[in-house]
A protein has these predicted regions:
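A generic short-segment signal for beta-strand/edge and adjacent turn/coil regions
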Residues: 103-111, 121-125, 133-138, 158-162, ...
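Membrane-proximal, glycine/serine-rich, low-complexity loop/turn segments characteristic
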Residues: 25-265, 272-301, 305, 311-312, ...
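Generic low-polarity alpha-helical segments
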Residues: 1-2, 7, 21, 25, ...
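Flexible coil/linker segments and helix-coil junctions enriched in charged and small residues
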Residues: 310-311, 318-320
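Bacterial Sec-dependent N-terminal signal peptides
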Residues: 1-29, 681, 705-706, 711-718
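Exposed, low-structure sequence patches enriched in small/polar residues
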Residues: 250-301, 305, 311, 327, ...
Length: 718
């Protein structure tokens, strides 16, 4: 075990202080945070890797760590790609992301308004805690064209005696950029300790997260200066922000314009069981050597052929306060154990008290020290001739209290009939906000929360969640309900309704550059309503669904990157179809999305989106090796995508760059031997189809030319 302890120390200290040139495939992230949506679900085969984990907000829902197969996203290690609908970035790996398909973002109280790096970050509620008998490690590494285009991810967990478990979740993205003055380095580190009392009446979770981004900006390609000569290599293509030579946190970029964003949080959460059945464990029974805390009195998700994130679960549960829809596969070895004899026990009512205290320290800084070359780029935002600077910092002390009750039997199992759970809570957030040059502000958020789970039969589940804000954000609220009906051989039907009212973010209301006020607004609150329905037929690889979004008082950034509020109602209907075909070893997976924005000039969206994977998968070399050879194609229809203003980290409207049908084509080969997986792939094959054109997804920010990327993943128990 000594090498694994060394690995933990290396990841912990290197992730925070090291210069790092590493990158890898991110491990399964939590389903309790984020703003991804109804297409984040993927059809995969069940697996047999006997490791399960859970998240602190939902400790009774065990999820199988079942991704040792060659899934359809293993060869796509970038966080913006992989499962579900892909997001678009600035061409460079690790850069700010925006949606291609509209999804509402969960809002709860005060929001600073900086979300361009959310897809790379790990919130404390998304740290997985593992139920294991042996130490567990999952390490993955991928590299692109150079040693400064790398990704590293590490999942590690081990037990310290029968009551304590430790978990580490680490992701590092490092890319020096292929065009001039580019750089991107993102780090997400989460570590946690779980203590379980032998009586089962107390569980405590200590977590620490460190998320950071360092970005060098070139403003995009100067298309007016591109010639046949200077476009032969990415490094000679002219860019809008030439800047001056400077070291960039060990990455070595030439960027004078840079962004630094750091979020750190330390938290302690604990559950008290006040009334209810204790764990049914013989006192004299010796636990297996190396065994850690037993799993909490768990709800075993019902069998299904889908794993990962549910299609309607994500947007409902981004707050981490409600339980996920139980559609995860339980594929561990316990499925082979004969079921125990049924014992009639009296039903009992369990009462749980939850408390969490956390402290977060977040700061964001942009600076450009070379305005002599960049003055034309910033226009009205260049308020000072010596340089530009934007700095904002928030420190948040948060306390969460919840009390809940659930009906259980005497053995600690959730009741299989007429089972239900009711929970009410209170959240207080004390926020200290620093923004140059105004004095420090103190804000208070107080939220009343509640959620109710009702399952009259094992085939029907209803989940509801609500919160209401008091004090500074008084009047903000969120209501949501999720219904799931398991129709057996006829499939699964899901429906969702959501409504929320929320105040503008801080950046939308007020912004300073180099201590000069650029804008100050008094926007009305935004009102959103979402209705969704999905029908799945897993045995045929079919899923059909739709969503309807209604947005009032929508806030956007106009063509000069100024915040504005729409006086008209925006409607966004969406229909999607996912259909997977297979014939022997030949597979074809398809996703189609149709969406329509009633105000394309305010909320531009591509009307059509498609994602296709054609591949051959089977065992070779006397069935010892599993191999997958395939091609991935992603495309969207013609539209005006939002541009990016790195000065304050927001995407904004533009009217000059319209991008039509330009598919992104990748060819990949993946192999697996036992628990070791590897891949090699070629990216941007369409460069050969259009050798004289740049590939843009975000205006002026081109994707790299043709390149080869390889990766390796190894997971083991020891």
């Amino acid at each position: 075990m000594r090498p694994l302890v060394h690995l933990y120390l290396f990841v912990f200290f290197f992730g925070i202080f090291g210069p790092g040139t590493l990158w890898a495939q991110a491990p399964p992230r939590g389903t309790t945070t984020g703003d991804s949506g109804f297409l984040e679900q993927i059809f995969v085969e069940p697996d047999t890797f006997d490791v399960s984990y859970f998240y602190v907000p939902n400790p009774k829902v065990l999820i199988s760590y079942d991704d040792t197969l060659l899934s359809n996203h293993f060869h796509q290690p970038q966080p913006s790609r992989g499962q579900g609908i892909e997001r678009i970035n600035l061409g460079n790996v690790g850069t700010p992301q925006q949606q291609l398909v509209f999804e509402p973002v969960f809002r709860r109280g005060y929001d600073i308004g900086l979300h361009q790096f959310d897809g790379y970050y790990l919130p404390s509620d998304s740290i997985p805690f593992y139920v294991i008998d042996k130490a567990f490690t999952d390490a993955a590494f991928a590299q692109g064209r150079t040693q400064q285009d790398q990704i590293l991810s590490v999942d590690f967990s081990r037990n310290f005696g029968p009551q304590v478990n430790m978990s580490i979740d680490f992701l590092r993205i490092n890319h020096a950029g292929v065009y001039k003055n580019q750089a991107a380095k993102n780090t997400a580190l989460g570590t946690g300790f779980w203590y379980h009392h032998p009586s089962g009446t107390y569980d405590g979770y200590f977590t620490f997260t460190h998320n950071s981004s360092f970005q060098g900006h070139n403003g995009g390609i100067d298309t007016s200066s591109v010639t046949t000569t200077n476009r032969s290599e990415e490094g000679t293509v002219p860019v809008l922000l030439e800047g001056t030579k400077m070291a960039f946190r060990g990455v070595g970029a030439d960027a004078a314009a840079e962004t630094r964003y750091q979020k750190q949080e330390v938290a302690y959460a604990h559950y008290f069981r006040l009334v209810g059945p204790r764990e049914n464990q013989p006192r004299r029974r010796k636990r297996k050597k190396g065994a850690g805390p037993p799993p909490p009195s768990t709800e075993v998700p019902p069998p299904d052929t889908l794993t990962g994130v549910d299609s309607l679960e994500v947007t409902a549960l981004t707050d981490g306060t409600t339980e996920v829809l139980d559609t995860m596969v339980r594929t561990d070895s316990s499925a082979q154990i004969p079921p125990p004899q049924k014992v009639r026990r009296p039903w009992k009512r369990e009462f749980l008290v939850f408390h969490k205290i956390s402290y977060a320290n977040n700061w964001y800084k942009f600076s450009d020290i070379s305005l002599a070359a960049d003055s034309a780029y910033y226009g009205r935002y260049q308020v000072h001739n010596q340089g530009l600077r934007h700095y904002i910092r928030e420190r948040v002390l948060e306390n969460t209290f919840r009390i809940g009750t659930a009906r259980q039997d005497g053995g600690g199992r959730t009741a299989s009939k007429n089972r239900g759970k009711l929970e009410v809570g209170l959240i207080h957030r004390l926020i200290r906000l620093e923004q140059e040059p105004v004095p420090t502000q103190t804000l208070n958020n107080l939220l009343l929360t509640g959620n109710w789970k009702f399952a009259p039969t094992p085939q029907i589940q209803l989940l509801t969640y609500a919160h209401y804000s008091l004090l500074q954000n008084i009047g903000d609220y969120h209501l949501s309900g999720d219904l799931q009906i398991d129709l057996g051989q006829l499939g699964v039907f899901e429906a969702r309704a959501q409504q929320q009212l929320y105040a503008p973010s801080h950046i939308q209301n007020r912004f300073y550059v180099t201590e000069s006020l650029v804008w100050e607004r008094d926007f009305r609150k935004t009102f959103e309503t979402t209705l969704a329905a999905t029908y799945r037929l897993p045995q045929f690889g079919t899923e059909v669904g739709g969503q309807y979004h209604l947005i009032n008082n929508y806030i956007y950034f106009d063509t000069i990157a100024q915040p504005q509020q729409s006086a008209t109602v925006i409607n966004v209907p969406q229909i999607y179809i996912r259909q997977n075909f297979s014939l022997g070893v030949l597979h074809l997976d398809n996703t189609f999305v149709w969406q329509f924005s009633s105000q394309q000039d305010l909320l531009p969206l591509p009307t059509l989106y498609g994602k296709h994977q054609l591949y051959i998968r089977g065992r070779i070399f006397r069935k010892v090796m599993l191999a997958r050879l395939g091609i991935d194609v992603q495309w969207n229809s013609n539209y005006l995508p939002n541009a990016y203003q790195h000065l304050f980290g927001q995407f904004h409207l533009q009217e000059t760059e319209r991008y039509g049908f330009q598919p992104i084509i990748d060819l990949s080969l993946s192999i697996k031997v036992k628990t070791v997986r590897a891949f090699v792939k070629t990216e941007n094959l369409n460069q050969f189809l259009r050798p004289n054109d740049f590939i843009f997804q975000t205006p002026l920010h081109a994707r790299p030319y043709f390149l080869i990327r390889f990766g390796l993943s190894w997971r083991f128990l020891n």
